[in-house]
Structure formats: structure tokens, C-alpha cells
């Protein structure tokens, strides 16, 4: 059983890696993938062995929280968390401004009164605005782990305690020896302020990456017009009642009027419009991508989320709740956005050692400055170590891949391209061979002819090419992808359709096993193969291919096996999917490059490495916190550029 569960308390990629590792260690869980970007865990588990309550208890023991209550949606949780974050950020800015005024402007920096006021302001900032960092760091400490919150908590606590010591004993310890001393409450406050500000901006940006899910969820109406069994007096019609969609049962009769969203999947029992007495026209563009409204008569199926554009219809509920086609699409997109690309698993392993490595670098920095710092050795050593702890940013590494994937998968869904898992989107850009089934995939059979006499029929009469098939094949081949058409037809027919579609390679008289054999042959030649099919006889080849695609109007078996489903008959979705994969992967590597380069350059600068070369430049803790906030926000904003492409 698969389920997507919201996770509370994750601050960086170390957190998501810890939660994932803990879930995977539990008996009864087949697989678990935790996404920092969506703050969810995609868990495949056996409910007979482990329950959601068991998972929640184990994750709570590890310092995080799983939200398993059905009445608490991810949207609601994220909204509440963001409201609290924003409130603390605004309060932190107030404390920061007051602290800066007292420490730098109004009264002398060494004034005992000013330092005591700054101490109180910094303490209030730590206890209220920075509470989440210390609670999280303490939980991590109890479980012998560390995350980004640990770095923030440690650095601000060191700066605060050192400043508190100087406030009460500075003159006695340092002044008596002729050493100039300072307090650094402003650094402690500004670190928390900048980190909170960065997280606020990051959350807003991440919220934009999930817009595709919200659009899909927006297609689900909240209420339905239920046709009751109570007749209207003096007529043969029945009374209707507006009810919550959650109360609809299978078999209920529902009326939907023009412009309203169909609430559940069902079968039309009655339809009418001003154009046709016995039919209504339903806009299915959001599901199938077809721009022309489909005619629906009694006996036709309709899907939740689609909209009658003309007329009204009555329907009997067939699939409700999580069993509707729309719910399945939403679930598929959520699971895909929560899944991990292969490169993300490598980053997660690096993230697990990142925080201990940064702590070690900070300790080494402290020792070196303590030894070579002269009279101001201790303050310089402390500030340098604090700057190193603050500037390190595992968040940027953790967000680099999932944010790009979330935007890419969401954008694909808007184009009626449903991607089941992140690895398919990542691998699609590598393909250099495409195997496509002819009938039902490349062409549309004519349903209005007698196939017992098809030998006497013209090829064009039997079937037609799908929309933009020639242009799609041309674009694929221009990208360097070799296209192979597989057909069960005789040589003459196969040659005709291959030539008409602009395909150079084709096979005729193909049996189901031949498709699998061709995929294997191409792979043995070193090619990365994508298989596109729509029928049961394509499933073996789909399962073997590096990337598999099914047509949305094909069989359920083919769609279950395929990693990518094209909801539209427009084959331009094929090159569009490849193009989107290329852009997404390019964005991932851009993000990773920035995340690693940022840490590689900024950590040494914060440690003061330029002093070795006689350059008197070093990043202060205050600027370090600003740069750290900027680094994670920039990664998310860069990923959002995909939405504009």
C-alpha cells in the first residue's frame, strides 16, 4: 500500500535523509522516499505488519512528526506553519532593529546599560524567534545526529554566551589586561533574523513549485447537486439537494449544469442542450488535452473535474472519492513529486556527513585563530568559528534536485504528461532510440468500418495518423533520436505508414515478443531506449525499456507498467516530454553546481583563509547568515524559471 504523508520538523536535506533512513529501517515498510521540497514522505508499506500510528511513533522518537489525521491536509499544515514562521520573522526583525540601534547608534558600544538592554533583546529573540532552532537541535542531539538547525543553534548560542560573559566580566577579564573587548548580541540576533527571512522567502518560492497540484485539486468541486427520490408535486421530476461531495455514494443520481464541475466519475443517464435534445457537450481539456468539447449521451462515461460547456446532464455515480480518475492523477503527480531521482540519493548521502564536517572545520578554525590571533585571539577565534557554522548551507544542496523536479513534473502535468517517478524524468533526456507501436499509438483505427473486409479497403480508410504525428517524429529525429515503428501489418502497410510518418526504421508482421527483442537489441548496442505503446501486447517491451510511455486512452495494464502517461492523442507531447526532461536536468545541475560552489568558496572565506595571502578580508557572522539565506532561496527561484520556459 502506498501513501503520501506530510512530515513536520524538517529543516534541511539532513533532516529528510534522517527521516527516510528511519522509515526504511522499520519492519513492514517496503520503500520510503522523503522530499524536503514538498515536506512529504512517500511510503510503500504492508498495513498488516506496520500501521501509520507505528510510523508516527517511531518518527516522533527521532525528533520529527508524521501527520496521519485525515482531516489535516498538507495545504492546511503548510499554511499554519508559514503563518507562525512569518510572525516570528517579523518579530525577529523588530528585535534586530532595536539591538542594532542600542549597540551601534544611540549609546557607546561599551556602555554597560546598552549591553544589558541588548542582552535582553537578544535573549527574547533567541527564546521566541529562534525557539525552533534550539528545539530541533536538542532533538537531534538526543538522537546523536545533527542538521542545519544544529549549526544555527550552536553558532547563535556561542555568540550570545560569549557576549553575555563580556557584558558582566569583560572589563574585569579583558579591560584589566589592556585588551579591547566587544559584545556580539547584534550578530546573534541578525543570524536568526536572516535565517528566518531566508526560510520565509524559501517557503513562498517552494509554494509556487506546488502550484500544479493546487490547480489539479482546484478541479475538484466541494459540493454536488444530488437528485433525491422525492418527487416535485405536480411533476414527474425529483427534488434536488446541494450536498458535500464527501456524502456522495456509488449509485447516487447527480445533476450537473453548464459551467459546473462534474463531482465524481459516472455514467450519463440523461443529457440535453440547445444544440442537441439528447446530448450535452463536456469540456475535457484539463484531463485529455482535447480542445473540442466531447458530446455525451446516455450511457457515456464522464470524469470528475470536467465541465459541461453546453447543456446539462444527469449521471449516476460510478467512482467516488480517491477512486476517481482525477484523484488518481493527483495522487500520481504527488507521488512523482515526492519520489527521488538517482542524483538526489547521492546528494542525500553527502548531506549526512555535511554537518559533522562543517562542525569539524569550525573547530579547526577556532583552534588556528586561538593559536595565531594574538591579543584578540579568543574573540577572533569565536567569530570565525561562528561564521563557518552559519554560512554552511545544506539546504541549498537538499533543495537543488527536488525543487527542479517538482516544477518539471508539475509543468508536465499541465501539458497532460503524467510522470510516475522522478527517475523517468531524469532519464528521458538520455534516450537516443524510440520504439513506437503503430496501431493505437501512432495511428487511430477507424471504428466505423467492417474489419472483416479490411483487406479490400484502402489503407487510409482503415486508420489515420494521430494529430501532428509527422511533426512529432521529425522533432524527435532532429534531436538525434532514432525512431523505430513496430507493426503487426504486412510489409506494404508497414512501409506505407512509416513513410507517411517520416520514420526510417520499421518492422512489419511483429509479434508481442518481437517488440521486447528489439528493445533488448538496441540496449545491447549501447542505446538508451524509450518504448511508447498502448496495449497489453506492449507491456513486456514497456517493462524492459529504459523509459516507458503509454497513451492515456490505452489499456490500464500498459499505463500501470509505463513510467510516463500521455493523456492526449497529440504526439507532439513526445518531443515536449523530452524537451522538458532536458530542461529539468539542466536546471538540476545548475542548482547543484551553485550549491556546492557556494559552500566550497564561502566556508573558507568565513574561516579567514585569505589572511594566509595577506588579504585582510573575512566574512562576518552577520553577512554569513545573509549569504546562507540567499543561497537556498536562489536555488528555489532558479527552479521556478522552468515555469516560464
Question: Locations of the language-model features?
Answer:
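Juxtamembrane coupling segments of multi-pass membrane pumps/enzymes
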Residues: 174, 187-258, 296, 418-420, ...
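Conserved ATP-binding TGD loop and adjacent catalytic N/P-domain core of P-type ATPases
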Residues: 38, 419, 429, 442, ...
